[in-house]
Swiss-Prot record:
This is Small ribosomal subunit protein uS12. Belongs to the universal ribosomal protein uS12 family. With S4 and S5 plays an important role in translational accuracy. Interacts with and stabilizes bases of the 16S rRNA that are involved in tRNA selection in the A site and with the mRNA backbone. Located at the interface of the 30S and 50S subunits, it traverses the body of the 30S subunit contacting proteins on the other side and probably holding the rRNA structure together. The combined cluster of proteins S8, S12 and S17 appears to hold together the shoulder and platform of the 30S subunit. GO terms for cellular component: small ribosomal subunit. Both N-terminus methionine truncation and retention have been observed for this protein. Keywords: Methylation, Ribonucleoprotein, Ribosomal protein, RNA-binding, rRNA-binding, tRNA-binding. The keyword Ribonucleoprotein applies. It comes from the Bacteria. One of its GO terms (molecular function) is structural constituent of ribosome. It comes from Rhodopseudomonas palustris (strain ATCC BAA-98 / CGA009). Part of the 30S ribosomal subunit. Contacts proteins S8 and S17. May interact with IF1 in the 30S initiation complex. Pfam families: Ribosom_S12_S23. InterPro entries: NA-bd_OB-fold, Ribosomal_uS12, Ribosomal_uS12_bac.
Length: 123
């Protein structure tokens, strides 16, 4: 416990809380260019090949974004939109790539939760 004199000499400093999505810089989304599209494996106890992309954002940040849904058309130099939201079983993946926006196509044959995957309404 500090004395009054110690507190006068150097007052208490409020700790700043760590941001969960620093690369967005308070924006809801950011645009970027894919520098590498690849698959990676999740933490234990899960097993899969998760599709991810390394993205260079317009503000200079380089982040890893998860590509949701079945199948995708992304490759190097694809222009994508990114949103916040981590993937719990992929360490270091703190962003999601938006489907159906810019160069990313929506998921084919998607009937439910279509808006989340950029799928058009079936006829």
């Amino acid at each position: 416990m500090p004395t009054i004199n110690q507190l006068i000499a150097n007052p208490r400093v409020v700790q700043k809380s760590r941001k969960k999505v620093p690369a967005l810089q308070q924006s809801p989304q950011k645009r970027g260019v894919c520098t590498r599209v690849y698959t990676t494996t999740p933490k234990k106890p899960n097993s899969a090949l998760r599709k991810v992309a390394k993205v260079r954002l317009t503000n200079g940040f380089e982040v890893i974004g998860y590509i949701p849904g079945e199948g995708h058309n992304l490759q190097e130099h694809s222009v994508v939109m990114i949103r916040g939201g981590r993937v719990k079983d992929l360490p270091g993946v703190r962003y999601h790539i938006l489907r159906g926006v810019l160069d990313t196509q929506g998921v084919k044959n998607r009937k439910q939760r279509r808006s989340k995957y950029g799928a058009k309404r079936p006829k």
